Design a protein with these regions (language model features):
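Beta1/beta-strand and adjacent pyrophosphate-binding region of the FAD-binding site
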Residues: 2-14, 32
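Core beta-strand elements of the Rossmann-like FAD/NAD(P) dinucleotide-binding domain
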Residues: 3-6, 191-201
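Glycine-rich FAD pyrophosphate-binding loop
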Residues: 25-44
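Central helical "cap/lid" subdomain
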Residues: 41, 195-241
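Dinucleotide-binding Rossmann-like beta1-alpha1 core, especially the glycine-rich loop
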Residues: 49-129, 250, 289-291
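Flavin (FAD/FMN) cofactor-binding and adjacent substrate-gating region
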Residues: 70-73, 95-166, 171-172, 178-185
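C-terminal catalytic lobe of FAD-dependent flavoproteins
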Residues: 152, 291-382
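Active-site lid/adjacent beta-loop-alpha segment flanking the redox-cofactor pocket in flavoenzymes
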Residues: 235-327
Length: 382
C-alpha cells in the first residue's frame, strides 16, 4: 500500500476544518482535509447561524469581534459564486427577570469597553422600533445592531471550495476511522477504505465525532453530542426581524434574507446523540412559544424541521489546544456557538499549526482545564 503524505491533515469538514484548510492553503501549506460525508453535513450545516458579539468574557469577545470584522467582505474574498446571505439585522437578548437583566447589563458594559456597539433598551424603545414584537413580561433587552445572520451551508462550502482552488486536497465521503501515533507523536490517519495518510501535524475538528477519534490514540476529550432542533417557515414579507433570544424558556427566532423565519428552542432532555431525528414535542412547543412573542406569524406554514448535534463540553466552551500526543491539535467542543467562530477558529488553528503566535490568548480554551477543575464559564451561553 502506498502511503500518501501532507504537511497538515485536517479531520472534519465543518466550518472550522474548512476555514483552517483555506487559511493554510492561502499560506502555501500542503494540506488535506477529510470529511465523512459532504462539507457541512454535521453541526455546521445544521446551525441556526446567528452571528453575535454578545458574550460575557473577554476571550470570546475578542474572537467574536474578529468574526464580525471578517464576515462583511468574506463572500468577495472567497470568490466561489455562492451567496453567503450575510445580513446585519441585529441580535437581541430578552430579559424577563431582574437578575437576568443585571447580567445582560454587565455583559454590555464589557462589550462596550471593547468597542462593540451593544446597547441596553427599554421595552418602550423595543416596541417603537419593532412594533410587531409582543412585549408582555419583558423588562429590558440587550441589542447589537452589527450582529446578524449568515447561510451556514454556503459558508462552509465556500471555505472548502476556496481552499481547494488554492491547492488544498478536500476529500469528501472519506471517513477517517482512526488516528495514527508512534512514540508519543502523531503520525497520520487511516480512512474507511484503508488508505493511510501521514503528516507531522493533524487537526482534529470533527465536532462530536472528535471524542471517539481522539480516543484511538489515547487522548481523552470530554465532549459529548446533544440533539438540537430547528424549523423554517414559508417566506413572508421581509421586515428585517433580528435574531430574538428569549431568556425565559430559551426560544429564539429570526428572519432570513429570503423572508422565511427560523425558530429554535433549547428543550431540556434532548438525547445525547449524533442522530439527526425530528421531535414532535419540539415542533409543538417552539411554535407556541414563538407565536407568543411575534403574533403576526400566526397561520404561517412550517416548511421543514431538522435537527443537528451540538458538540458539548462540561463548561460549554471550546477546546483549542495541542494534546499530549505531539503534533495533534484539537478544535472542538463549541457547544452550539461554533459556526459563527469559523473565521477566528480557522485563523488561530492556522497560526498554531504554522508555529505562529495566535492573535488571541487561548489559555481559557486549554484541554487541561477540565482535569484542573478550572472550568471556563461563559455567562452569555445558550
Amino acid at each position: 500500500m502506498t502511503v500518501k503524505t501532507a504537511d497538515v491533515i485536517i479531520v472534519g469538514g465543518g466550518v472550522h476544518g474548512a476555514s483552517t484548510a483555506y487559511e493554510l492553503a492561502k499560506a502555501g501549506v500542503k494540506v488535506v482535509l477529510f470529511e465523512k460525508e459532504y462539507l457541512g453535513s454535521g453541526g455546521s450545516g445544521r446551525s441556526a447561524a446567528g452571528l453575535r458579539q454578545h458574550f460575557g468574557t473577554e476571550t470570546n469577545l475578542h474572537m467574536a469581534k474578529y468574526n464580525l470584522q471578517v464576515f462583511p467582505t468574506l463572500e468577495e474574498e472567497l470568490d466561489t459564486g455562492m451567496p453567503l446571505e450575510f445580513t446585519q439585522w441585529g441580535y437581541m437578548w430578552v430579559a424577563y427577570a431582574d437578575s437576568v437583566l443585571a447580567q445582560l447589563q454587565k455583559n454590555v458594559d464589557l462589550q462596550r469597553s471593547l468597542d462593540i456597539p451593544s446597547v441596553m433598551m427599554t421595552p418602550d424603545e423595543v416596541k417603537a422600533r419593532w412594533p410587531y414584537l409582543c412585549m408582555d413580561g419583558i423588562i429590558g433587552v440587550a441589542f447589537c445592531g452589527d450582529d446578524g445572520h449568515i447561510n451556514p451551508q454556503t459558508l462552509t462550502l465556500s471555505y472548502g471550495h476556496a481552499a481547494r482552488r488554492l491547492g488544498a486536497t478536500v476529500k469528501t465521503y472519506c471517513p477517517v476511522v482512526k488516528l495514527l501515533a508512534e512514540n508519543g507523536k502523531i503520525k497520520g490517519v487511516v480512512t474507511e477504505d484503508g488508505e493511510e495518510w501521514h503528516a507531522p501535524k493533524v487537526l482534529l475538528s470533527a465536532g462530536p465525532w472528535s471524542t471517539p477519534l481522539a480516543a484511538t490514540v489515547g487522548v481523552e476529550l470530554p465532549g459529548y453530542p446533544e440533539r438540537h432542533n430547528l424549523l423554517i417557515t414559508e417566506p413572508v414579507e421581509v421586515f428585517d426581524c433580528p435574531m430574538v433570544l428569549c431568556l425565559d424558556d430559551g426560544a429564539y427566532f429570526k428572519q432570513c434574507p429570503n423572508g422565511t423565519f427560523m425558530f429554535g428552542r433549547d428543550d431540556p432532555g434532548e438525547p445525547h446523540t449524533t442522530e439527526c431525528s425530528n421531535s414532535a414535542k419540539f415542533l409543538e412547543g417552539v411554535t407556541k412559544s414563538v407565536l407568543k412573542r411575534i403574533p403576526a406569524l400566526s397561520g404561517v406554514r412550517v416548511v421543514r424541521q431538522w435537527s443537528g448535534p451540538y458538540d458539548n463540553t462540561p463548561d460549554h466552551n471550546a477546546i483549542i489546544d495541542w494534546t499530549p500526543v505531539e503534533g495533534l491539535l484539537v478544535d472542538c467542543g463549541w457547544s452550539g456557538h461554533g459556526l459563527q467562530f469559523g473565521p477566528a477558529g480557522g485563523r488561530v488553528c492556522k497560526e498554531l499549526l504554522m508555529g505562529e503566535k495566535p492573535f488571541v490568548d487561548l489559555h481559557r480554551f486549554r484541554l487541561s482545564r477540565f482535569a484542573e477543575n478550572d472550568l471556563f464559564f461563559e455567562p452569555a451561553f445558550i
